[in-house]
Structures are given as C-alpha cells and as structure tokens.
Amino acid sequence: MHIGKKNYPNLITSFRMNLKKIILNHDRFSHPERWKTNALLRFTFVYIKFLFDLMIIKNPLRMVGKTYRDAVTALNSLQSNYANIMAIRQTGDRKNTMTLLEMHEWSRRIGYSASDFNKLNIVHITGTKGKGSTAAFTSSILGQYKEQLPRIGLYTSPHLKSVRERIRINGEPISEEKFAKYFFEVWDRLDSTTSSLDKFPHMIPGSKPGYFKFLTLLSFHTFIQEDCKSCVYEVGVGGELDSTNIIEKPIVCGVTLLGIDHTFMLGDTIEEIAWNKGGIFKSGAPAFTVEKQPPQGLTILKERAEERKTTLTEVPSFKQLENVKLGIAGEFQKSNASLAVMLASEILHTSNILEEKIKCSSNASIPEKFIIGLQNTKWEXRCQVLEKGKNVWYIDGAHTKDSMVAASTWFRDTVRLSKRKKILLFNQQSRDANALVNNLYSSVSPEITFDDVIFTTNVTWKSGSYSADLVSMNTSQEDVEKLKVQESLVKNWNKIDDNRAKTHVTASIEEANELIETLYDEPADIFVTGSLHLVGGLLVVFDRIDVK
C-alpha cells in the first residue's frame, strides 16, 4: 500500500493516539505504583514503545525531492513523540547508556570515526545557564582571527526560527542549499549502509538516529566538508551521555553556571547535574568554569576533572570588561564573556596564533581583537531589544529558574524609569510554568507592574499550523489544543497579582501579536519570555510582517 507524503503524518498521529488509549486504559498500566514493583511490566511497555518508534523512524519519509523543505520534513520525522517520552519517564529510566556507542556506529556508517573529528580543534561547552551565549562569544572572538582561522564552526541548540541556526560558519547559519546538500549526503549514506544486528539489534535497515543525534552527525559532516579550522560545540543536554560527547580530544572544555534543569535525564540535585556536566572533561584538555558556582556543584566538577586527569580553573569576571558593551545584553553575561575569553585563548595559543595564553586573573590584559569579538557577538532572543512600530519588545527565551530571574531582572532594570504601558507575553509548555511565572513576578515586583498579561501557546499561526522549522512533537497536543497550561497560568497570575492586570489567552503567537497591537494607542514595553519556542515563533511572525 502506498502512503502519500501528505497522509503519512495523519496516519502516524492516529496510530499513536489509538496505541496510547489501549495502553492507558489497560488496568495494569493505569496504576503507577505497579511500575515500581513490576520490572517486567516496565521493560515490556518501554520495549513496545521502543519498537513503535522504530516503525516511525524506519524510512520516516521517502523523499522524492532533495530541497531544504524536504530536508526539514525528513528531519522532523525523527523527533520523539510526546507519548513515548512520557512512557519512558514513567519507568524512571534516566540513562540511555547506548548513546555514545550508537553515535560511534552512526558515524562509521556515514564514513567517519570519532578520531576524524579531532581535526576540528573543538571547544566543548556545557552548563545549565548561558552555554549558548558563551559559545557565541567564543565563536565571535575566534572569528576576529580570519587570516589564521578562515572558517569557524558553531553548533548550538535549540534553534529559534530555522534549524539552520544550529550549524553556523563564521557566525552565520549555513545556507538552505548547503543544509539540504549535506543533510541528504548523511541521510543517503545511512540508507546505503547497515549495522550488525547482534551488536545493535534496533538498528534495522532503514532506521535513522533521532533528531538531535542526526543533527550532531550533520554538524560534523558539514564542518569537515567546509574545512573549518576550529569549532565550538554546545552540549545538548548534560554531558556524560550527550551525543556531542563522542568528541574524544577537545582542545578545551567550558562549564557555565549550573542549575536545576532536565531533571529526568540528569538528576534532581546539583551534585547529580554537575556529575553529568563534568562528563565532557577529557585528559589533556584543560577545563574552565565561571565563578560563583554552587559549592556542591563545584566540588563535583573538581572531582570529575581529577578523575579525567585534567585541570579545572575558575574564571573571574575580568575588570577590563566592566565598561565594555557586550553584543549580548545583561549584566550576568560578563561572566559568560570572561569564560569565553579563556576558552578562545586556549584555542589560539594551541594554534600558535597567540604567543602567550591570557592569564586567568581579574586584572588580566585582554587583546583588542577579543574585545571587538565580544562587542560584535550576535545572539537573538537573549536579552534582545526590538523596536516595532510604537512598541518596544524585550525578548529573552529564559526557561529555567535562574535564567528567568536573570532575564526578569534585566527587564526590570532596563524599563524601570519608562512610563509606557507594560505587557507580558509568556508561555512554557513542558516545564513547571507556574513556578517560572512566580520567579518572574517576584523578580520584577514591586518596581514593575504589568497592565496586561497574555498567555499563549507556541503554535505559530492562527490557522493552527507551525512554521515548518518549529514543528515540535514532544508536547501534549491535547494540552495545546485545550489551552490547559494557559488557563492554569491565568489562575495563578490572578492569585499572585491580586487581579490587577488584565489577563488574556490566545491559541497562537500570531493572535497574541495582533492582540498586543490593538490593546493601546499609546506605546508599550512588552516582555516576552518563558520559552525559546515562543521567542522563535514570535520572530518568525515578525519576519512575515516585515516582508509584507
């Protein structure tokens, strides 16, 4: 039976929903306590779900064309669905210890060994808050040495508007043409090769790695083909078992501020999270971290460095940066910029571009090219200010407690003296949204009071569709459609704000933007936060308006 491309996603969705109903309605699956006592039950359920996902990933879409749109469609078919994620969470199984073995095997199948990636002279960065900004700062500094380093690769996640943002060269996302070219080179190599089913029983012919693993493979392939002289890699989640940890010999490693996030995968204590982050440390590659780490976390990081036979150095905020206007706003970015200085220094010294490393001292002298690199760093949706018509938008994709406090403090301090109306646009679909709103509220009060508060979904368009690059299958579609999270946020806000602000709920980002434009004739300051998906969707909406 031939399944057309247009009908395929609908059939998949229907099958998933029916499977979920069967499982959840079954008596054994409806009692959570039985998960803890019946190991066979847990294994059976996850295995069923695992096989089902293989059915989805096996030949996800047979592509007729090989355009950028075709590549995005194929890539989206590799996402894990919400029901499967929740099923695995219910088992309490945090670790996929096969990840790195699988990455080595996938790499072999596309023509590489892990040692091939050593030529990329990699900076490997992990952390909870600020690792993307630190990666951007580091890349921008290295980009000032174009004669010696003509091409600098940068791999980050997630993306805001286009998946191409994850794979950059000299600070710019690769073109749609190059993305499609390299994407299908990897895709076709995987199709034309096989794995030993004795060693990898789930790697059946036609199967593909998941979304993030595929993009990680694609980044290595792209940077090697483009002859990048140095690359900056941001960890996806954690470090120890992250797909990027196939990197065997980084030049230097960095750890930004630690906090509580991704607890299902990393653990719910700072110690557990630090242990995972420290998993990227490698023998012979010095490691640096920001100052003012949580003491318990710093202790674990030091232990991990000793275990991996390397050094860990705390980086103070450099005094020379105190009066420098960084390309990414926010006072807290000074520590990320300082860390980036040390990471770039290691790369440039190892490459014989700097005669001496920069001293890790607050009074150290920083070269002018480093300062220019920090000033010229561009990183959308992190403490970003945009003027649109009569309104000023303050945008930050904060989605953890610490980042929310930092972003909210930045907004408060920036608009404290402004007499404009204040509007909040917020969403967080998969974490504890109400806790984040409480962090936001306590950070801006009492200096800032919002006149209007809008809770929206991450759906891009009022037609109910997403921008193709922003399709996400890891949230509950039922919750999105019924606006469950948004209605809960309204109740919570009215309680903590004593019903002072007018609250609104919209089903899409486009509708939220249209509502904001009609609320007041006078100018307003608008704070957008809670989710990088929300921020990315808003920027896509802005782009369409600008084209019109």
Curated annotation (Swiss-Prot):
- Report the catalytic activity: (6S)-5,6,7,8-tetrahydrofolyl-(gamma-L-Glu)(n) + L-glutamate + ATP = (6S)-5,6,7,8-tetrahydrofolyl-(gamma-L-Glu)(n+1) + ADP + phosphate + H(+)
Query: Binding of Mg(2+) 1: at which residues?
Result: S157, E234
Recorded superkingdom? Eukaryota
Family matches, as PROSITE patterns: FOLYLPOLYGLU_SYNT_1 (PS01011), FOLYLPOLYGLU_SYNT_2 (PS01012)
What EC number(s) does its UniProt record assign? Answer: 6.3.2.17
The cofactors required by this protein are: a monovalent cation
Q: Entry's InterPro entries?
A: Folylpolyglutamate_synth (IPR001645), Folylpolyglutamate_synth_CS (IPR018109), Folylpolyglutamate_synth_euk (IPR023600), Mur-like_cat_sf (IPR036565), Mur_ligase_C_dom_sf (IPR036615)
Protein name per Swiss-Prot or TrEMBL: Folylpolyglutamate synthase
